[in-house]
Amino acid sequence: MEFRLPVLLSFLLFFLMLVRHWKRSKGQGKPPPGPKPLPILGNLHQLADGLPHYAVTKLCRKYGPVMKLKLGQLDAVVISSPEAAKEVLKTNEIKFAQRPEVYAVEIMSYDHSSIVFSPYGDYWREMRKISVLELLSNRRVTSFRSIREDEVWNLVQFISENEGCIVNLSERIFIMTNDIVSRAAFGNKCDDQHNFTALLEEILQIGAGFAIADLYPSLTFLRPLTGMKPALERIHKKMDKILEQIVTEHQIKRKAAAKNNTKFEEEDLVDTLLNYAEANKNEFHLTTDQVKAVTLDIFSAGSETSATSMEWAMSELLKNPRVMKKAQEEVRQACKGKSKIKETDIQNLEYLKLVIKETFRLHAPGPFTPREARETCEIGGYTIPAKAKILINLHAMGRDPTIWKDPECFRPERFEGSSIDFKGNHFELIPFGGGRRICPGISFATANIELGLAQMMYHFDYKLPNGKSLEDLDMNENFGMTCRRKENLQVIATTRIPFQK
């Protein structure tokens, strides 16, 4: 009996430990695979060699389409297959409808009032409704047609006036898209537009990469040491002054119309927001700061996405003369005899649309679509914990040989006869995201890109400066909120189709 009692107690203790382990394992579920993290750093050291999105994609090839990473203090899950992306963005879209908190956004977005980064809830739903039904509806995008045609034409004139000289095409494309968005959002090119654009550039540079404040959120004492907070506060103060002036000018015009008993004609996106605030003031209180936040959202996202995509499309066309020739022949045949292309002329340019799809496949405006798990759930057979940061890896899916034949080859013909689009319905190609938080500006961006590319291909032939061959064109990119070219695209243009000034 003396011998049996210790054995029985030992067995009971062992059994209780097994039960405890089983319960813990059941509660945690099956975690996604991933590389072993280091103390403090996690897996950050594995992203330090080269561009982070290339490093993450390389790890995904090894560990699979649902991969766990430890980024400092953050638990991140990288999604790299259309099937897993569909589970996140469609099957479980409410569970992943949250955007992760970003320190820079906290400072710049007027207390998370932007459409892009505001928390999932009543405010976000209301602003999303305004965006889809009012700000960026198809009717509204069509109403901006004359603005697009004017500003694309200004780009064509600039290139023509500098025929035979080196043109910084990247710079001119970004100026064009900024002008389009400025006129659509503010009603005209604002006096401080150059300063405003320069401030946006600063935000993109500061926000590029992984910020210490985001990777180690509990170590708040580190924030002053990086210099990020004072830099962002300085930029925000300057931007707020410009936006405040714009909103005030619009309010003055509205008051003048009311005083004179004249009908106020809505002109731009700021007018639309102010009209909504006035019409719904008893149901939904839209503050001036929220108007500024949404305006900043539209300006930054609308300009940056269109310009980055156009820049990469022109780069790929130059790098692939066969594709350039085919695209030029299509637009020149369709618009033969015309000195100026209008938006209605490009509706049937099917190959141009394939070029844009192929550009989005290889060069999504941003390499990752971020989400946050609102609750614990299962993706691809793995348990995703609540609060985990989700990175949908557009870069990996666009270059996956199991999805695309010869994925590194720029071949628009791969989409011929295909129903695949980039509007969130086909998860192998989601440059604008998907689900409830899909970018509401798809139509606006697409219209800018189509007209800009069509005009540039119609009127000009191009070569690289300084006798460089097309094979020498540098296709390296930067990492940031959007992935621009590392070096500006510089070309020498020759007029092929004359135009009338």
From Swiss-Prot:
Monooxygenase involved in the biosynthesis of limonoids triterpene natural products such as azadirachtin, an antifeedant widely used as bioinsecticide, and possessing many medicinal applications including anti-tumoral, anti-malarial, anti-rheumatic, antibacterial, anti-inflammatory, anti-pyretic and diuretic effects. Catalyzes the conversion of dihydroniloticin to the protolimonoid melianol. Its main location: membrane. It is an enzyme of class 1 (oxidoreductase). Its cofactor is heme. Keywords: Heme, Iron, Membrane, Metal-binding, Monooxygenase, Oxidoreductase, Transmembrane, Transmembrane helix. Heme binds at C439. This is Melianol synthase CYP71BQ5. The keyword Zinc does not apply. It comes from Melia azedarach. It holds the Pfam family p450. PROSITE patterns: CYTOCHROME_P450. Pathway: Secondary metabolite biosynthesis; terpenoid biosynthesis. It comes from the Eukaryota. Belongs to the cytochrome P450 family. It catalyses: dihydroniloticin + 2 reduced [NADPH--hemoprotein reductase] + 2 O2 = melianol + 2 oxidized [NADPH--hemoprotein reductase] + 3 H2O + 2 H(+). PANTHER family: CYTOCHROME P450 71D11-LIKE, CYTOCHROME P450 FAMILY 71 PROTEIN. One of its GO terms (cellular component) is membrane. SUPFAM superfamilies: Cytochrome P450 (SSF48264). It is a single-pass membrane protein. InterPro entries: Cyt_P450, Cyt_P450_CS, Cyt_P450_E_grp-I, Cyt_P450_sf. It is found in: Membrane. GO terms for molecular function: heme binding; iron ion binding; monooxygenase activity; oxidoreductase activity, acting on paired donors, with incorporation or reduction of molecular oxygen. The keyword Protease does not apply. Its EC number is 1.14.14.-.
